[in-house]
């Protein structure tokens, strides 16, 4: 009888332990990519770490591998300096943790700096002792993502990080650390490419192989980029998500800003600014990307249609990477757009609107186009310059590049008078804040009479319906932040009426001067109008045939006419389902049907000698792939901001039930 009772108690104890054991099985931890910086995101990071405490201690590890210059070796001097620099971040993180503790809480903070900078460090068994089961969060610092992941990839340390994350540990990463939070990782721009070259084939080095990648458990359905608007990285992210065998969605996290990724659902933007989502999958923008050769000495440039553009600010809007849907609104199954405003009145002369030519006037394709239509008597109008001398210097540069004698005037407050016999007018400017819009009004009759007009740089935006009268982006960091990032807050960009020759809004130097915030502000406040961002050395030529891109780079068209709009808790712009197109030189600016079930016409992907770890497959130029209705992505149903469940795992409790049954049976047999 006694043995039967013991058997029964043992069986009951195991069965009662099953629910507790199952509850102890944690979901994977959150991912917190932070675009750059520390101070403005420490508060939220500390709160997440405290909420994830595994006991009485909030245990945080600081991983500073991105500080290394080489993931295979390090000098003692560099190690000492790295430890010293990272210790400052450890102290700051500890302070954030302390401030996040609830009042009266018995929790304590334990923040440790990992002495791991190389592969050798990550294979040292002694360093595994830091990775205890109670770790709440690992915080990966900024620096170089190549060495950041390179120091731990395929090592016992990475394996242990994988285990801890699978059991609920949070991974936060800033700057390079954020880049590591997507499995497919942008390593850098390729050698010889600058930020202005992001749209050119071969510009981006992408790591997507077993030995070169981001964290294995990182975001699977998107590629993360950081410093996004601060460094105008939209071109390189578009480039990355258009590559074969790469997720066709990009997440661009701005500096001093973070976001939560929970099982591929993005939510709870924290910090100061915005997070962009570029969806090149829903309407097959990545599959239909075109590679256009504009210069035999340069790689082809990439042309995009129907990228879905989302913007998230702090607030309640979420984005599901699995379904590619925003909680604010779903994308339409089809979208048939018209760009009827990209036309000029019948009988008007050609109009060229360019994004800044002054640094490359010699052999400028845009200026050469103007020369072919301008005739012999060009009149240069300078406006928006700080002084007459500054205007004269600029006029001379354009005059020399034109290679002919011209008449010119520096406009202050008086309306211009066009000299008799003028065949074309070139309007140039430096500072949109100082452009004298009213003084240019007399130009319209001249243009409507069939005469060519060109406007460059700061003079160009005033020819749209509205423009942003601001100075160029300043060099000092505080004012630069105000111009490039705070412009994503409502009311931080001044907007004034333009001349209205073309019923759009315009912004020059869109990448070179980091003006996406200004363009977004124009688009958000006038969503009925197309918003055009024009790169340096690039222009739109309007004539009787329509609008055509000329020059050396791309033009961004933001279309918010069917987008859903909302302001975040910081008055930041929140946008769902805007449309983004990139037109390149030689192309007419005409939209294409956006259809989730449209056939895909894939162009050959140019292959260049790059540092990519594995060659990417390409299709022959003549290949045409047709997707049937069943193969096309379904129209997303309306979704709530829910957390996706993890893939089902083998129920471990079944083993315990079986074991209990066996033990009970054996004991009963022995009793008999």
Regions found by a protein language model. Name each.
Residues 1-9:
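Bacterial N-terminal signal peptides that target proteins for export
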Residues 140-142, 160, 164-185, 447-467:
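Catalytic nucleophile loop
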């Amino acid at each position: 009888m006694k043995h039967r009772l013991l058997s029964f108690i043992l069986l009951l104890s195991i069965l009662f332990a099953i629910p507790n054991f199952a509850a102890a099985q944690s979901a994977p931890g959150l991912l917190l990519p932070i675009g750059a910086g520390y101070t403005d995101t420490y508060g939220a990071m500390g709160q997440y770490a405290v909420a994830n405490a595994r006991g009485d201690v909030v245990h945080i590890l600081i991983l500073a591998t991105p500080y290394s210059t080489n993931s295979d070796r390090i000098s003692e001097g560099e190690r000492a300096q790295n430890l010293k620099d990272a210790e400052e971040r450890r102290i700051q993180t500890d302070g954030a943790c302390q401030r996040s503790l609830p009042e009266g809480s018995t929790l304590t903070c334990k923040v440790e700096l990992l002495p791991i900078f190389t592969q050798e460090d990550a294979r040292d068994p002694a360093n595994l002792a830091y990775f205890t089961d109670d770790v709440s969060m690992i915080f990966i610092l900024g620096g170089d993502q190549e060495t950041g992941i390179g120091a731990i990839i395929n090592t016992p340390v990475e394996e242990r990080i994988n285990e801890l994350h699978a059991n609920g540990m949070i991974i936060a990463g800033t700057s390079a650390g954020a880049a590591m939070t997507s499995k497919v990782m942008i390593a850098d721009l390729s050698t010889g490419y600058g930020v202005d070259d992001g749209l050119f084939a071969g510009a981006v080095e992408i790591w997507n192989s077993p030995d070169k990648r981001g964290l294995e458990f990182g975001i699977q359905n998107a590629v993360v980029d950081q410093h996004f608007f601060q460094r105008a990285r939209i071109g390189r992210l578009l480039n990355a998500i258009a590559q074969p065998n790469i997720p066709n969605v990009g997440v661009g996290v701005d500096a001093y800003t973070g976001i939560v990724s929970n099982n591929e659902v993005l939510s709870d933007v924290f910090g100061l600014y915005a997070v962009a989502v570029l969806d090149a999958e829903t309407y097959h923008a990545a599959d239909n990307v075109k590679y256009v050769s504009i210069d035999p000495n340069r790689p082809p440039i990439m042309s995009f249609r129907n990228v879905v553009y989302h913007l998230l600010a702090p607030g309640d809007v979420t984005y599901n990477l699995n379904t590619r849907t925003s909680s604010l609104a779903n994308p339409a199954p089809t979208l048939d757009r018209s760009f009827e405003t990209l036309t000029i009145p019948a009988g008007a002369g050609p109009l060229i609107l360019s994004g800044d030519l002054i640094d490359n006037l010699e052999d400028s394709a845009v200026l050469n186009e103007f020369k072919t239509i301008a005739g012999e008597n060009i009149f240069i109008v300078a406006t928006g310059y700080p002084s007459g001398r500054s205007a004269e210097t600029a006029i001379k540069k354009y005059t020399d590049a034109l290679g002919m004698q011209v008449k010119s005037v520096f406009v202050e407050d008086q309306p211009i008078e066009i000299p008799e016999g003028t065949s074309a007018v070139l309007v140039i400017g430096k500072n949109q804040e100082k452009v004298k819009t009213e003084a240019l009004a007399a130009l319209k009759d001249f243009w409507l009479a069939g005469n060519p007009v060109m406007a460059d740089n700061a003079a160009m935006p005033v020819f749209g319906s509205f423009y942003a009268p601001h100075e160029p982006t300043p060099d000092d960091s505080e004012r630069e932040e105000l111009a490039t990032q705070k412009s994503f807050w409502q009311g931080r960009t001044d907007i004034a009426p333009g001349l209205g020759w073309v019923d759009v809004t315009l912004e020059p130097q869109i990448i070179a001067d980091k003006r996406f915030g200004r363009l977004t502000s124009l688009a958000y406040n006038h969503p009925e109008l197309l918003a055009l961002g024009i790169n340096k050395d690039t222009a739109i030529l309007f004539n009787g045939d329509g609008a055509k891109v000329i020059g050396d780079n791309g033009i961004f068209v933001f279309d918010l006419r069917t987008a859903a709009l909302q302001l975040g808790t910081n008055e930041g712009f929140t946008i769902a389902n805007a449309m983004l197109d990139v037109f390149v030189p030689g192309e007419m600016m005409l939209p294409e049907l956006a259809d989730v079930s449209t056939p895909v016409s894939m162009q050959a992907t140019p292959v260049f000698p790059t540092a990519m770890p594995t060659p990417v497959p390409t299709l022959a130029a003549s290949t045409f792939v047709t997707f049937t209705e069943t193969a096309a992505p379904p129209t997303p149903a309306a979704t709530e901001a829910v957390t996706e469940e993890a893939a089902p795992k083998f129920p471990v409790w079944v083993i315990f039930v079986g074991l209990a049954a066996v033990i009970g049976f054996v004991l009963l047999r022995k009793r008999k």
